[in-house]
From Swiss-Prot:
GO biological process, one term: lipoprotein localization to outer membrane
Gene3D superfamilies for this protein: P-loop containing nucleotide triphosphate hydrolases
Name under which the protein is recorded: Lipoprotein-releasing system ATP-binding protein LolD
Family affiliation: Belongs to the ABC transporter superfamily. Lipoprotein translocase (TC 3.A.1.125) family.
Subcellular location, principal: membrane
Source taxonomy: Bacteria, Pseudomonadati, Pseudomonadota, Alphaproteobacteria, Rickettsiales
Protein role: Part of the ABC transporter complex LolCDE involved in the translocation of mature outer membrane-directed lipoproteins, from the inner membrane to the periplasmic chaperone, LolA. Responsible for the formation of the LolA-lipoprotein complex in an ATP-dependent manner.
Chain segments annotated as transmembrane: none
Originating species: Rickettsia bellii (strain RML369-C)
UniProt entry tagged with the keyword Cytoplasm: no
Cell location: Cell inner membrane
PROSITE patterns reported for this sequence: ABC_TRANSPORTER_1 (PS00211), ABC_TRANSPORTER_2 (PS50893), LOLD (PS51244)
């Protein structure tokens, strides 16, 4: 039996521009089950990032509900820490902190002691092939290594779902495949669902479900 972990129910997002209303998302519905891999494609400006921000409680819908773990939430910092992880095209690592220091931060914020957080970070960085780069600064890492650190940081609290916005968009094709393979491997080991926005159709077709966002609506592709 599937275990639904995130639902967008009749979600709309509208912006007013002068006397006009721009309908970015229009009565959109999406159900995400535990461990499910979902890709969303669409043209630039179609609302893909807006959709992720609403799903991740970083933005509010004009209408509709965001339901996480069977509860409706408008915005909640603790829910984001416990249930959601985020990965972006830019790694957003703190340049003055080492790889492992960047990774342990969400764990410490979530209440873990430093020893436990370090052990968890070592384990996940090692699984991503960075066991020998724990104490490197971001500037000492390649682009692919930086993004793997960002992936480790997003997974450190074992979230139920990862929201990924073009997670390999800045990487060359070879590095893209290497990073994406490791990302899927660790997510599957943790039974973490992924919702990924991407322009890379090859990666999109490797997911369980593929949706296209067009005219504010999601359609199975």
């Amino acid at each position: 039996m599937s275990n639904k972990i995130l639902t967008l129910k009749n979600v709309s997002k509208h912006y007013r521009q002068g006397n006009s209303i721009i309908r970015v998302l229009d009565d959109l519905n999406l159900n995400i089950n535990e461990g499910e891999l979902i890709a969303i494609i669409g043209s630039s400006g179609s609302g893909k990032s807006t959709l992720l921000h609403i799903a991740g409680l970083l933005d509010k819908p004009t209408n509709g509900e965001v339901i996480i773990a069977n509860n409706e939430y408008k915005t909640n910092h603790l829910i984001r820490l416990n249930y959601l992880g985020f990965i972006y095209q830019q790694h957003h690592l703190l340049k003055d902190f080492t790889a492992i220091e960047n990774v342990i931060m969400p764990r410490l914020i979530n209440g873990s002691n430093q020893k436990e957080a370090i052990e968890a970070a070592k384990s996940i960085l090692d699984s991503l092939g960075l066991g020998k780069k724990l104490h490197n600064m971001p500037g000492e890492l390649s682009g692919g290594e930086q993004q793997r650190v960002a992936i480790a940081r997003s997974l450190i609290n074992k979230p139920k779902i990862i929201l990924a916005d073009e997670p390999t968009g800045n990487l060359d094709p070879k590095t893209t495949n290497e990073v994406f393979n490791l990302f899927l491997k660790v997510a599957k080991e943790q039974n973490t669902a992924i919702v990924m926005v991407t322009h890379n159709h090859e990666l999109a077709h490797r997911m369980d479900k593929l949706y296209k966002l067009k005219h504010g609506a999601l359609n199975m592709s």
